[in-house]
Structures are given as structure tokens and as C-alpha cells.
Amino acid sequence: MKKYGYVDYDDTNVWVLTKDDYITTLNMFDQCYLRQVMSEFGQMEQTELVRYTYQHYPYYATKSHIAKSIMTKEEMDRIYKQQKKYDSSMLFTIGYEGLSLEAYINKLIINDIRLLCDVRKNAYSQKYGFSKAQLETACRGVDIKYIHVPQLGINSDQRQDLRSQKDYDILFDIYERTTLKENADALNYVRGLIDSEKRVALTCFEKDPKQCHRSRVAKALMAMPNKDYSFKAL
């Protein structure tokens, strides 16, 4: 926001809003909507705003660390009813392509995923929220564990010039014969995480699992003996 001039530092190193009158740059309809919001919520204190949100949208309080201290027992009962809890063990796969961080995290919450297993070789992304430290922090904030298993990733130079599904299939066939076999310990480690955490998601970038190696990791995990978990692609 500093980059675009919306906020700035004052001489005490505290973030402050700039003095520019941005409302005059809005069209008359947006100005009207903004004034309506200010009229309804402008005089509320922070706790009042949080309570209003939790009362009207209890789902957003399901991972809150402060809800119990500001909500009534009856309101907490409504919040508990929004929580998703499943007894079944399940392996998931999910790609973040085309998703905002909020939409992505909500998918994890709705499916009661308890551990996110990042199978990228390099857990770095130019997309906000999906580099390792950012994603781990976001998961921690909603009580989801995060772990990075780079041994199961594919080097970026191997992913060049993939123009058709056949190109992906050839690459992933090689991946199964080499990387997966050479990193059996890492694969068994993930299997152990599924056994202990019960609901685990493998994640990488691509939206289409057929164009991501996580599908082959999942295939190998589903082929393991004595498993008691099922599979779902998100």
C-alpha cells in the first residue's frame, strides 16, 4: 500500500493514512456505498466489528482464537455448528493455480485438512501467499500444520516445453521411475503423516492434477498396502 501511496510512515515509524482525498476519485455510486458503510459501521469499536462479523457470518469464527472471549454461549453454539470435523482418514491433492490465498485456505478448512504437505521442489511463488514462509504462516493461523517435502519435487528445468498432456505424461512417467523410487523414504514419511494426522493434502501449483506430479505422489500413496485412507482431489 505504501508503494501505491495509500499509507506512509510518520516520524514515529507508525503506519498512517495519507492525507489525499481519495473519495473524490471514486464515481458517485462507489462514494454512496462507502458512505453507507461508514454510516453503519464507522462508530463501532474493533470488538464490536468482530462480534458483528461473527454473529452474521459464524463460519469466519470457526478458527478464531478470540471468539470465546467476546461471544455468548448461544453464539458459540452457532459457531461450533459451522465447524467441519470428519472421522474418516483421507488423502487430498490441491493446486493453488487460479485461487486466492483466502479461497485456498477455505478449501482446506471446509475439508477438515489437518496437515498440508508441500511437494514443490522449491517452495517459492511469485503469487502472494504461496511461498513457503507465507503459506506456513497462513496455515498456522487456522491450526493447520504445514510441512515441505522437497525430495518429492521436480526440478523446474525439467518442466520446460510442456505443450501437451502427452508431454506431461512422459515427464511424470520418468518421475515415477526415478524420483519416486529414489526417494522412497520421503514417500514413506508422508504415509506416516497420513496415518498420524488422518487428513492430509498434497499441494503444488497446477490446477489440473493431471498436469502436476502430485497426482503421481498420490497414486503411489494409494497403492501402498494396509492403508485405511481414501482419496479426493480438490
Where do the language-model regions lie?
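Residues lining hydrophobic/aromatic ligand-binding pockets adjacent to catalytic sites
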Residues: 1-234
